């Protein structure tokens, strides 16, 4: 009975999500040719205002990682999980400068993605194609993260009636169908519903769990300090190696990487003007306050459901939810967590499709005028590959996140420095501009 109620609530909200995505695209003109259709599908026609950009980019911070991965690392290690709050807040500060710059460059030259910018900046279409291939490889673990997270949610709220393998497939099918038909605009609309549910459910759990299990925060924190003090300092619980040096370097690198993440850039390019991005850079850090909730509740689960190991720790928060709440409430919280997978996963798959449609497949003459259709096919292929990885190479959610960020960091010099430093040339060309010749190499001796 509980499984029926929870999955029914979940099913109704998923149907509403798809309907909302379709409604968002109704009446939107394709523009001139398929390229116009690609711009509308991939960057929302560059017409999204402050509210939509805010909820869309906030979706980057509130994924299934927030509900499951942050709670899991809070359960396993404790304090090191705070790197998430650190790098995102610093990333928003950097984005205050970088976001408007990327938006202006793309707007001026009619570009729709990070690979477009690289190809245009260095005048090498093949370089844009190479970046598209590399970025796809780097982003697949993050798509896998969202499939894993949503699959865990679906299986858990069904009280085990739906196996994890089927739950992973449901996550893939719902998100792939959603992104193919709705594009970035649909993701922005659904982000509004997601954010309302995230704020409401996390706000409720922040008060309910400590009261229900510990009679309030006072007794809970007393037990945490007395019995689990190791979780409150670096390097956290166990021999994790996640000390202060790891925290500082990871936070710094991720804060730089997040501003050139293809999905972040998609949010930048969807804005109707640069001021929208500056306002969002100031407002978004306040949203990070909610991230402390799953981290704390993950540590609360240490006393309620001890003994979770490996990937099982991702279930720490939902173990508390299923154990203490009625089925309809489990369904609603499951919907919030699922939407926290769907929105970012949709944007990731959308970006992968756009990169290939614009920078790789467009190099094939027959496909040049069919970029949007080609991009949608790539979305399905990329989602299928991520689903295959989920079945064959499972991992904890935080590890998958770190893999993607560490890999994307390799593109930082090309993307960020290439746009900020106009004299930077491909491969540090042998013949720099004459006014800078002495800075690049010493003068040759006469022979």
Tell where the protein language model's regions lie, with residue ranges:
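Loop-to-transmembrane helix boundary motifs in multi-pass membrane proteins
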Residues: 121-129, 136, 354-395
């Amino acid at each position: 009975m509980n499984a029926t109620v929870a999955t029914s609530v979940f099913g109704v909200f998923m149907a509403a999500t798809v309907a909302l995505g379709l409604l968002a695209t109704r009446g939107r003109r394709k523009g001139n040719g398929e390229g116009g259709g690609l711009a509308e599908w991939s960057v929302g026609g560059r017409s999204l205002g402050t509210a939509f950009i805010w909820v869309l980019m906030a979706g980057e911070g509130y994924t299934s990682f927030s509900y499951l991965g942050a709670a899991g690392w809070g359960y396993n290690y404790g304090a090191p999980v705070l790197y998430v709050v650190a790098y995102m807040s610093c990333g928003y500060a950097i984005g205050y400068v970088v976001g408007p710059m990327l938006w202006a460059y793309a707007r001026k030259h009619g570009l729709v993605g990070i690979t477009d910018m690289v190809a245009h900046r260095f005048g090498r279409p093949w370089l844009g194609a190479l970046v598209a291939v590399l970025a796809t490889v780097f982003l697949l673990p993050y798509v896998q993260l969202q499939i894993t997270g949503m699959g865990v949610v679906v299986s858990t709220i069904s009280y085990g009636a739906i196996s994890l393998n089927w739950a992973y497939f449901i996550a893939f099918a719902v998100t792939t169908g959603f992104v193919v038909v709705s594009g970035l605009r649909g993701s922005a609309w659904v982000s509004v519903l997601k954010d309302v549910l995230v704020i409401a459910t996390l706000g409720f759990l922040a008060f309910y769990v400590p009261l229900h299990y510990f009679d309030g925060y006072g007794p809970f924190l007393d037990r945490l300090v007395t019995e689990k003090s190791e979780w409150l300092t670096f390097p956290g619980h166990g021999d994790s190696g996640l000390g202060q040096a790891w925290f500082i370097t990871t936070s710094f690198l991720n804060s730089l990487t997040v501003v050139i993440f293809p999905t972040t850039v998609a949010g930048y390019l969807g804005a109707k003007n640069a001021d929208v991005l500056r306002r969002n850079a100031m407002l978004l850090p306040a949203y990070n306050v909610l991230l402390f909730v799953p981290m704390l509740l993950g540590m609360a689960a240490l006393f309620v459901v001890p003994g979770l190991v490996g990937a099982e720790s991702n279930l720490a928060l939902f173990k508390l939810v299923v154990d203490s709440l009625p089925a309809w409430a489990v369904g609603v919280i499951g919907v919030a967590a699922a939407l926290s997978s769907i929105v970012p996963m949709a944007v990731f798959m959308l970006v992968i499709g756009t990169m290939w449609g614009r920078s790789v497949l467009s190099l094939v003459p027959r496909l040049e005028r069919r970029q949007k259709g080609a991009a949608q096919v790539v979305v399905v292929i990329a989602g299928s590959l991520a689903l295959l990885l989920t079945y064959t190479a499972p991992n904890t959610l935080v590890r998958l996140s770190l893999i993607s960020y560490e890999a994307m960091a390799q593109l930082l010099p090309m993307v960020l420095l290439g746009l900020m430093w106009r004299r930077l040339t491909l491969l540090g060309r042998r013949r720099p501009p004459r006014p800078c010749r002495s800075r690049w190499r010493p003068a040759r001796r006469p022979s």
